[in-house]
Swiss-Prot record:
Disulfide bonds: none
The species this protein was found in: Rattus norvegicus (Rat)
Phosphothreonine: residues carrying this PTM: 874
Originating gene: Coro7
Protein name: Coronin-7
UniProt xrefs under SUPFAM superfamilies: Quinoprotein alcohol dehydrogenase-like (SSF50998)
Length: 922
């Protein structure tokens, strides 16, 4: 702005809209990421919800008198760190996450029928994705950052075109210049860098940006050579700087605001040159005009906000109310609402003002990824914002197919919002088969009511592949009244082969750090704060290696010691009252310390143990003797598991092999196959009714992964492999045979993965993962009978913290909870009653578990519930009146008034009055 020429924006006013225009009743969530937490296209708004991995989607404009409803898109299994709409396709959304992937989503025009699987998956990266942005001129080009890495992606080919030179620290911002030729980055090493990604991977220019390395953001102006950065100076004051890339050694201009700790979000409109600075956690917006002349950063206006700002976004210029002289609209994301803030220049005439609204870039891309990478520099054709020159041609990207539901298609019920608390964790689903083979899937609709799907839905599902009915599962830490607190002296260094603690429906056994291998036994029916005095314990006499409850006797506990002995303890029915020093039975036979213990799933008094002597021994507890000894392992045995029918035993070993034994027929393995490459630890569990084996372990790069084997074809290797993340602890699987769900988490993790495992492709169906507020030391699945069936609780677990024990409930949102959800709760096996005794099993007999219905008395199965008839929607009065002419409205109004008055023949009130007599007139 020339100092001798008044700015056309000098009288601009910024005002929050009326409450009627707010998008309320939302629950926004923010994290310490480089993103703005909210983005807008000309049609839709997307924002971070309070559930990790879940985005809220809502229409930008309300329709008639209808209230806008937020729908939720389950994007990732961890926090969404950044998101962006395509500048050309209003319904193409990209999301980046802490789960190290970038996903592209095709949204519907209404924003209601949301996809359950992404259209494209990019990655995974080595670190969480921090920033992403679509290219401003070419369709299908995306820039992203992850840690110190910056990549430019060809979305159509699902591969990166180039990886820019590694930065020296975390990349905090990456933005395209308006012509799409260069990329500007801001790094935690305080450097600004300019890249020409098509020329070379090294930076063409660099300079020091701000003296403080905290949260530097960038925004490119409408003039190619100018760049705005925001950050903090050495005095921790917030500041903004304007840079001329032709003279990049120092800033062209700078302004200092205040010492507030909230990071500045720069929102710059390249057409008008208006810069809005929004501070996270604050209630004020600053607006400046950016010009190449001095003063280069001129204050225009400020706006006081009613609520604290959690995120902010600009509405595209093509969606502005230009006839009202609205030159900017900022969407403020608060904790409970999205508030439009309109910036208007007062003008007397209600007309289109060309000086306020120059032509802007249209919605048709100038090129695609291939032509742009080949050197094409065509610019997007500009269009007028004058309403008289609209509509402009719209563009639909071919990157993802457009799948709109037919008008008569049943829409999935909106996911009810859970009454979540701060202690809850919720992460959303996506269907990944393998990180190395990203899926290219579109919209997938499935019923969440438990009643069934329409033929059109089934045909769509057959086209796009299956999705889990548990994908919207919600994990909740139950109320504090059910917690056991004030735990002290826990042994948090149990071997990796042990779960760290064990539980049944009555009590929990937790090893303590004190000498002598002490084990505390806590009653689940007596929650609350434990006394500060010492608890009565089991004096094992040797350090505890593993411990497990007898599934058929809730009072018997087996404890494996470092002295190669197995001790069987009997806990009194009311719990421990005194210290127990003498076990019921001591089993001796192993020559080295023991890895793990596993009870037989059907036969009473049968126990398997693995040891450092590289053998597995099977014990008859009734006789107190070793009956079988399995051999063939060449190294440490990581894990063992009984098959559901109790006939076979599977192991995974440090020698990189998975083995299956038939213990009663041979001490050598029946078959074996290749196992995980990493030697840090592994677990094995039978899934899919015993038809498959699931192994969790590490690959050669120490990435945690899942491998699924066909139980009768181990030699062929895994049928499916799924990489998860990089973490030091082994994933401990807890499998629920009724639902086919496996819960996976490690000691010291804060996240529990949920997958539905099926025996055919895609094998793993990802569901919402559970995120806890702090790391847990163990995670145990309780028997199905502990679940609240009426609340559609399909799993209940115990979470061990350093000082407390917390129950966690996993529920499935259902609309008609008054019915028994028989599709979620099939008859369950009676795991607490044996099918045969040890003597019969060792002689070759087999048994079958009894089945128990979980249907509560008086509840009707949802499969037998009457179908709900959808209410017929009648047009609103406003819509009805709009369809009539003025003359018709006038006639109807007069008729209504006449009808109200009516032609009544009733006597008038004065007719009943009595007059005076005739003689009184005289």
């Amino acid at each position: 702005m020339n100092r001798f020429k008044a700015s056309k924006f000098r009288h601009m006013e910024a005002r929050p809209s009326r409450r009627e225009a707010w998008i309320s009743d939302i629950r926004a969530g923010t994290t310490a990421t480089c993103g703005n937490h909210i983005k807008s296209s000309c049609s839709l708004i997307a924002f971070n919800s309070d559930r990790p991995g879940v985005l809220g989607i809502i229409s930008l404009e309300g329709h008639e008198e209808n209230k806008r409803h937020v729908t939720y898109l389950g994007c990732h299994s961890d926090l969404v760190t950044d998101l962006d709409f395509s500048p050309f396709d209003d319904f193409l959304l990209a999301s980046g996450s802490a789960d190290r992937t970038i996903k592209l989503w095709r949204l519907s025009s209404t924003g209601e029928a949301l996809p359950s699987v992404p259209g494209v998956v990019l990655g995974p990266e080595e670190l969480p994705v921090d920033v992403l942005q679509f290219h401003p001129t070419a369709d299908g080009v995306l820039v992203s950052t992850a840690g110190r890495t910056v990549k430019v992606w060809d979305v159509a080919k699902q591969q990166h075109l180039t990886e820019l030179e590694a930065h020296k620290d975390l990349v905090q911002s990456a933005v395209w210049s308006r012509d799409g030729a260069t990329v500007g980055t801001a790094c935690k090493d305080k450097q600004l860098r300019i890249f020409d990604p098509r020329a070379r991977a090294q930076a063409s220019q660099s300079t020091q940006a701000h003296e403080n390395n905290r949260d530097i953001r960038l925004a490119w102006t409408g003039i190619q050579e100018y760049l705005v950065s925001t950050g903090f100076n050495q005095m921790r004051e917030r500041e903004a700087k304007l840079w001329d890339t032709r003279v990049f050694s120092s800033a062209l201009a700078s302004i200092t605001l205040d010492t507030s700790p909230g990071s500045l979000i720069p929102l710059l409109d390249p057409d008008s040159g208006l810069l809005v600075l929004a501070g996270k956690g604050e209630n004020q917006l600053y607006c400046y005009e950016v010009t190449p002349q001095q003063p280069a950063l001129s204050p225009v206006t400020q706006c006081i906000l009613e609520n604290a700002l959690r995120g902010a976004a600009l509405v595209p210029r093509q969606a502005l109310a230009v006839m009202n002289c609205e030159v900017l609209q900022v969407l403020q994301l608060s904790d409970t609402a999205i508030i439009p803030i309109s910036h208007r220049v007062p003008r007397k005439a209600v007309e289109f003002h060309e000086d306020l609204f120059p032509d802007t870039a249209g919605s048709v891309p100038a090129s695609d990824a291939h032509t742009w990478w080949a050197g094409d520099n065509q610019q997007v054709q500009k269009v007028s914002l004058n309403p008289a020159h609209r509509p402009h041609p719209r563009f639909t990207s071919s990157l993802l197919p457009t799948l709109e539901p037919s008008p008569n298609m049943e829409q999935p019920a909106e996911l009810p919002r859970a009454d979540t608390e701060l202690s809850e964790g919720f992460s959303s689903p996506s269907s990944l088969v393998s990180p190395s083979t990203p899926s290219s899937l579109g919209l997938s609709l499935s019923s969440t009511s438990g009643i069934g799907t329409s033929p059109s839905q089934r045909s769509l599902q057959s086209l796009l592949g299956p999705s889990s009915k548990f994908r919207h599962a919600e994990g909740t830490i139950l109320h504090r009244d059910s917690h056991i607190t004030n735990l002290k002296g826990l042994n948090l260094t149990t071997p990796g082969e042990s779960d760290g603690f064990c539980a049944n429906r009555l009590r929990v056994a937790v090893p303590l750090l004190s000498s002598g291998g002490q084990v505390a036994v806590l009653e689940l029916q007596k929650p609350g704060r434990l006394p500060d005095t010492a608890l009565p314990t089991l004096q094992n006499g040797a350090a505890v290696m593993d411990l497990v409850w007898d599934p058929f006797d809730p009072h018997r506990l087996a404890v494996a010691g470092e002295d190669a002995r197995i001790r069987l303890w009997r806990v009194p029915p009311g719990g421990l009252k005194n210290v127990l020093t003498t076990p019921e039975t001591v089993l001796t036979g192993h020559t080295e310390k023991i890895y793990s213990l596993r009870f037989h799933p059907l036969a009473a008094d049968v126990l398997a143990s693995s040891s450092y002597d590289l053998t597995i021994r099977i014990w008859d507890l009734q006789a107190g003797t070793e009956q079988l000894r399995l051999q063939g392992h060449q190294d440490q045995i990581f894990s063992l598991a009984w098959s559901p029918d109790g006939k076979q035993l599977a192991t995974v070993c440090k020698d990189g092999r998975v083995r299956v034994y038939d213990p009663r027929s041979s001490p050598l393995p029946l078959q074996d196959g290749p196992g995980p490459e990493g030697g840090r630890g592994a677990r094995i569990v039978w899934v899919c009714n015993g038809g498959c084996l699931l192994v969790s372990g590490f690959d050669s790069r120490s990435e945690r992964q899942l491998q699924l084997y066909m139980a009768d074809a181990l030699a062929e290797g895994p049928s499916a492999l799924l990489g998860l993340d990089v973490a030091p602890s082994t994933l401990l699987p807890s499998y629920d045979p009724d639902t086919g769900l496996v819960l996976l988490t490690g000691k010291g993790d804060t996240r529990v993965f949920l997958y539905e495992v099926i025996p055919e492709a895609p094998f793993f169906l990802e569901c919402n993962s559970f995120t806890s507020p702090d790391p847990h030391k163990g995670f145990i699945l309780l028997p199905k009978t502990e679940c609240d069936i009426q609340d559609v609780e399909f799993a209940r677990c115990l979470r061990l913290r350093q000082t407390s024990l917390e129950p966690v409930a996993f529920r499935l949102p259902r609309v008609r909870k008054e019915f028994f959800q028989d599709d979620v709760f099939p008859d369950t096996a009676v795991t607490w009653a044996s099918a045969l005794d040890a003597k019969a099993w060792f002689k070759g007999a087999n048994g079958q578990p009894r089945l128990l219905s979980l249907q509560p008395p008086g509840m009707t199965p949802v499969s037998q519930a009457p179908r709900e008839v959808p209410a017929r929607r009648t047009p609103s009065s406003a819509q009805y009146l709009e369809e009539k002419s003025d003359q018709q409205k006038k006639e109807e109004l007069l008729n209504a008034m006449v009808a109200k008055l009516g032609n009544r023949e009733d006597p008038l009130p004065q007719d009943s009055f009595e007059g005076v007599d005739e003689d009184e007139w005289d």
